[in-house]
Each structure stands twice: as structure tokens, then as C-alpha cells.
């Protein structure tokens, strides 16, 4: 348990670049600071489903598994120097920059298409 957390703390201070093999090859379930984590490598189809549902279409990130915070289940990933979570419905949360201080304080809105794209002709 402590080794995966220590690995993540080390990567936070150095780099997550090319670290997929150093994180975990098997499922590791832990509870840490009131949160439930399952560290593992999800199937590619699962990753695509969650990320595309949240409007994330690049691969400059590291998927770490799942996290449950305040009964909200999310896929956990590291991107842009922070941990993020994305729900099955596509809601994205920026959780924080340290595995020891994650919270649901910040929601990221990626879908802004809430308006009607109709065109009106002039009456000229």
C-alpha cells in the first residue's frame, strides 16, 4: 500500500513521463485520507469511454485507476501536473496536485455546447 503512494509522491516531484510500467501491474485497493483507491491499468476501451465522455481527446496523461471521494466514483488520471477524476457521465474534476491532498473543490467544464446553432436569414 505505502509503496504505490510513495511512487506517486516521487513522480509528483519528478515526472510522470513514461511511468506506466512503474505504477502497478495488478489491482491495488487502498483507503487513504478518507478516499478509496483502486490502482490498476484499465482496458483501453474503458479509458476511451470515460475520457471521450468528458471531452478529453489527447493522450498526454497517465491513467491510474479509480477513486471514490464522497461516494462519487471516478476514473483517476494525472494530467497537466494535477490529479483529475472523470465520472461515467463525463463530469471532470481537478482533484489536486498531491495524492495526499485530493478534494472535489474544482469542477472543470469542457462541454460548452448549450446553445442552439440555428441560422436566421435576413428578410432583405
Swiss-Prot record:
Source superkingdom: Viruses
InterPro entries: Poxvirus_A31 (IPR008786)
Pfam families recorded: Pox_A31
Name under which the protein is recorded: Protein OPG159
Stated family: Belongs to the orthopoxvirus OPG159 protein family.
Amino acid at each position: 500500500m505505502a509503496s504505490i503512494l510513495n511512487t506517486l509522491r516521487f513522480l509528483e516531484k519528478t515526472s510522470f513521463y513514461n511511468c506506466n510500467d512503474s505504477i502497478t501491474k495488478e489491482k491495488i485497493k487502498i483507503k487513504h485520507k478518507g478516499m478509496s483507491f483502486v490502482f490498476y491499468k484499465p482496458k483501453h476501451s474503458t479509458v476511451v469511454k470515460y475520457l471521450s465522455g468528458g471531452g478529453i481527446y489527447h493522450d498526454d496523461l497517465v491513467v491510474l485507476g479509480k477513486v471514490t471521494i464522497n461516494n462519487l466514483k471516478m476514473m483517476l488520471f494525472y494530467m497537466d501536473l494535477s490529479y483529475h477524476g472523470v465520472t461515467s457521465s463525463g463530469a471532470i474534476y481537478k482533484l489536486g496536485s498531491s495524492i495526499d491532498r485530493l478534494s472535489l473543490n474544482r469542477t472543470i467544464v469542457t462541454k460548452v455546447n448549450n446553445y442552439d446553432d440555428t441560422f436566421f436569414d435576413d428578410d432583405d
